[in-house]
Amino acid sequence: MTSFYGLSQDFDFHKPLSIPISIGAYFGDLRPNHFHMGIDYRTNGVEGLNLHSISDGYVSRVRTTPYGYGQVVYINHTNGLTSVYAHCSKFSGKLDSVVNVAKLNQQNNEIELYLDSNAVPLKRGEVFALSGNTGSSTGPHLHFEIRETATDTPLNPLLYGLGNKDIYKPTINSIKVYGLSNEGFIIPKKSKTINVTNGKLATGNTIVLPANFSMVYGTIGIGISGNDPHSTGSCGLYENKITSYNDLLYHTKLNRVSFEETRYINTYKDYSGYKSGLKIHKLFKNTTNQFNSTKTNSTGRLKLYPCDSIPLEIETIDAFSNSYKIKFGLSIESGKMDTTQHFFPETRYWIPNKKYEIHLSNCSLLIDTLSLYEPTKMNLLDKGQNISFGDVNQAIHKPIIISYSKWKSSKYSDKNYFIGYLNGSHYDYCETYIDNNLLKTKALKFGTYKLILDTIKPKITPLNYTNFGFSSKSKILVWTIADNESKLFKYDVYINNEWIPADFEYKTKKLKCTIEKAIQEIYCILIIVSDVCGNENIIETSFP
């Protein structure tokens, strides 16, 4: 039996798309706060291509939402795997009927259904949906995943024969050397970056570090940036190794990533470097890193002294076993060791393995143990309703709980209040809840937060009809709907007093619904839009 790229089983999968395979992103590519959990198939810049079931199975789950994966389908197969198809523009056949019936029964445009094996069975190659650009997609494509059905863990689809055979080697573009604490935390302003061109260091065969990289209470770590070219583009790195004297110091391999551990990307990569546009894979780990794709028990951290010199070899390998190696020496100049004992004084830094409860004038912060990846500057600023804390160039692993104590007013409903995060000049809505009379949110970003009162109803603008009639004979009605304060919650369309399914695209702020009636049969259109703070706007249009 033939295996796919090292697998012991032959998976004879049908391609998800009928066009030639062109891949825009690989499994494991570095993204904000998560690994890319699948592969992105290009669709030639268009929507509406047939999506095929890769094998016999049944639709086990389907969801419609304006955010995230948009319209997404999950298919369970008989081999213990689940395939996922995200950003669909439309469902087809029996699946389309099942979704529409559910929307009508629930009178809700955003639904999630879990189906048994008899609801929508599929054969290998059968079409069940069309490709699209719904949800958080930035352009037409198919985001495709393979998951282990029993655990819902995403697996690398390239290992199942779902990509083009690749003959190109990955490359390393730069090497970065870090000064680290004994715990593996990155010491500010103690690093050196060396460019790599055609397999050669810009510094020759050796990286020479100042004597202060030798630390009594510290270590050294290595990181690399690079890319993996293939026949239709270039993606991120898959497997990385670093050795010295033939001893394996560190090894990572992105075969599978669970949703529970995907945020560990913020310590797998150089997070502050990523914020500035660099994608650096760290070849070492600190004490907060519990990511399971590390294949060695060692930490990858090096202990060197003045005048020390060691040979290093870095190898990066793609999913098709194409390999790229670079060998170089790492040396420390003569001089005095750095004797600093506390690189992160606790008067100015929060430390990852400690718990903090901070009480401010109108709110409190709860930072649990291991909420942080790295020691983080406090940067506390208390202005009552507005607070700022932490370092925007550092990430948060477990949410920091913000609790406002003074927020209620007898003049307004409790629902009218929310906590916002400053994003540029606008405050983004944060999921807000009430607990023991405290207004709370779970913060996953450092920065500025504010207690906000929202009494403004959402805006609704019809685009192809007015009180005087319809501007075209189109069977699709279109509105723009927006909420500039908090966040849209629900949107309902009634035609002739009958609830009609509608689709909202938050990127364009357009709400669309397809009408089955003839234009001349419509005598009333009612649209109701509400936000998460309970504000509601209703527009009713009657036609003669």
Residue ranges of model-derived segments:
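Surface-exposed, glycine-biased beta-strand/turn segments
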Residues: 7-82, 89-91, 109-118, 123-124, ...
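Exoplasmic/lumenal beta-rich domain surfaces
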Residues: 82-118, 185, 190-211, 241-303, ...
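Contiguous beta-strand segments within globular domains
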Residues: 197-242, 394-403, 469-485
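Conserved structural position at the C-terminal beta-strand
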Residues: 226, 316, 527-529
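Surface-exposed, short loops/turns at beta-strand junctions within beta-sandwich domains
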Residues: 303-309, 443-445, 515-522
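Short, solvent-exposed loop/turn segments at the edges of extracellular beta-sandwich modules
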Residues: 317-322, 530-535
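Proteolytic processing hotspots in large secreted/extracellular or virion-associated proteins
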Residues: 338-340, 345-349, 374-418
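Proteolytic cleavage junctions
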Residues: 344-358, 394, 409-416, 420-481, ...
